[in-house]
Amino acid sequence: MSVEKALKDLVKTGVYAMGFKQSLKAVKAGEAKAIVIAENTPPELRRKLEYYAKLAGIPIIVYRGTRMDMGLVMGRRHGVSVLAVIDEGSSRILEQAEEA
């Protein structure tokens, strides 16, 4: 399954926190099971997320596309740099982390 298909399924059936602040909050609270990050996420945000994800033992899935592409896949009209997967629903997005 591709990351794009998994993201679409996550939006329909899962629970997630969207955006840098909400995703970081979910990681710090121990709610996040994985982080999905767009390829062109600003380096300073990416470093901070990678640091906290590593401390929490949470995998990071890199979406091979821009923030705008990721937002469009999720049905948004704006870019999405980061999202935290709280409950994958039927998306099987966590398998993407295992393959990475």
From Swiss-Prot:
GO molecular function, one term: structural constituent of ribosome
Biological processes per GO annotation: translation
UniProt protein name: Large ribosomal subunit protein eL30
Family that this chain belongs to: Belongs to the eukaryotic ribosomal protein eL30 family.
GO CC annotations, alphabetized: cytosolic large ribosomal subunit
Domain of life: Archaea
Classification via Pfam families: Ribosomal_L7Ae
Keywords for this protein: Ribonucleoprotein, Ribosomal protein
Species this chain originates from: Aeropyrum pernix (strain ATCC 700893 / DSM 11879 / JCM 9820 / NBRC 100138 / K1)
